[in-house]
Amino acid sequence: MRFSFMLENLSKPVIVTGSQIPLSQLRSDGQENLLNSLYIAANYPINEVGLYFNNKLFRGNRSIKAYADGFNAFDSPNLPPLLEAGINIKLIEGKISEPVSLPLKLAQITPQPIGVVHLYPGISVELIKNIIKQPVKALIIRSYGVGNAPQNQAMLDCLKQANDDGIVIVNCSQCIKGTVNMKGYATGNALSKIGVISGNDMTLEATLTK
């Protein structure tokens, strides 16, 4: 969630919420999500950008849309919820914050040409070449497991040339849980040697924003 990177020195919570069923419908989850978000913001001031859905408050830049048609619409694969709201409200990863006296900083985020490549067996090097021929400033590789890629020297040469040309290349796993470790296997280590940066456990959305 880009707000997490745009708003610095927050002195109050910013909570984003919504609904899976439109608010105009009788069974909408929107009213409960909104009321709980307001109550939590007023009484449990976790001064960061959060996402509240279905009784859970997630860190904004750690959350992903996980379900298309369930009330558990969002998840945070690599970080427990900040807070859970049941009969009682329970802090988990969240911490009640003291107000800060620093002025709010609003970082400007402008659209950037970024390529995303989802690796698969037999992927053509020409496909990657065509992407980096465009005026891209960065390339995100969706790799296997802990950051592995096909053992393809032509692809490595292509990525190395892109890195030498100033294109930032980040390795993000296709897995939603766990972290990239390019030292774990030879194929991942080969990416590291040509200058590919580890995305660690960031979501694709957070990587694109950064």
Language-model features and meaning:
Residues 9-13, 44-48, 53, 79, ...:
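Short coil/turn connectors at secondary-structure junctions
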Residues 59-146, 151-152:
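Accessory alpha-helical/coil subdomains and C-terminal extensions
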Residues 16-86:
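Internal gly/pro-rich beta-alpha loop/helix module
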Residues 15-18, 50-54, 118, 142, ...:
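Short beta-strand segments
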Residues 146-210:
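C-terminal non-catalytic interaction/assembly regions of soluble proteins
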Residues 1-12, 151-158:
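Short Gly/Thr/Asp-enriched flexible loops that form oxyanion-binding sites at enzyme active sites
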Residues 11-22, 190-195:
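Glycine/charged-rich beta-loop-alpha catalytic/anionic-binding loops adjacent to active sites
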Residues 4, 38, 128, 156-160, ...:
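Short amphipathic alpha-helical segments and helix-helix/interface helices
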